[in-house]
């Protein structure tokens, strides 16, 4: 019982004492935005549990996945609703995925990318969605 109380206190402190607007999380977000979207600024920054959801001035949406140790890493970039028909920065797209898109869908650009522990999901400018496993094999294709 004592362990459960301590765990509940720890989790409660960890979840309430972290913010996306200050500290290390804000620094990670600001560095990411300045690096990959230098002509924009953050207009909304919403904390969702340990995660942070950010909207930029061009309406790009970025999801950051957090953990109990304060680490924050991007897990989704969505440029589909931007005011400037922006594509996902090439530096965020693994080479294997870029090569596949260029080879098979040459004239299309990547407008959304998401990653998790199973692999990667992308959406192209023509609306085609492609899912890759960790080894960058195509495992699902939805047009």
What spans do the regions from the language model cover?
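A generic structural signal for short, solvent-exposed coil/turn residues
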Residues: 12, 34-36, 46, 102-105, ...
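A broad structural signal for short, well-ordered beta-strand segments within beta-sheet-rich domains
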Residues: 41-42, 69-72, 106-114, 138
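Hydrophobic transmembrane signal anchors and adjacent membrane-proximal interface regions, especially
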Residues: 2, 16-18, 31, 69-72, ...
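Amphipathic N-proximal alpha-helical interface segments
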Residues: 53-82, 126-143
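Short, non-transmembrane alpha-helical segments in secretory-pathway proteins
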Residues: 22-41, 85-109
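Surface-exposed charge patches in extracellular/virion surface proteins
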Residues: 34, 66-67, 103, 118, ...
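Bacterial Sec-dependent N-terminal signal peptides
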Residues: 1-28, 33
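Exposed beta-strand-loop-beta-strand "reactive/processing" segments of non-cytosolic proteins
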Residues: 41-64, 111-130
């Amino acid at each position: 019982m004592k362990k459960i109380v301590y765990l509940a206190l720890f989790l409660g402190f960890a979840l309430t004492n972290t913010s996306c607007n200050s500290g290390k999380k804000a620094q990670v977000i600001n560095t990411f935005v300045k690096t990959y979207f230098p002509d924009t600024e953050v207009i909304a920054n919403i904390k969702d549990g340990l995660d942070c959801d950010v909207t930029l001035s061009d309406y790009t949406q970025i999801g950051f996945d957090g953990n109990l140790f304060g680490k924050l890493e991007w897990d989704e970039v969505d440029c589909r609703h931007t005011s400037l028909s922006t594509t996902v920065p090439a530096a965020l797209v693994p080479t294997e995925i870029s090569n596949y898109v260029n080879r098979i869908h040459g004239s299309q650009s990547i407008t959304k990318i998401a990653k998790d522990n199973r692999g990667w999901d992308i959406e192209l400018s023509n609306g085609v969605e492609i899912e890759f496993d960790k080894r960058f094999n195509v495992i699902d294709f939805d047009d």
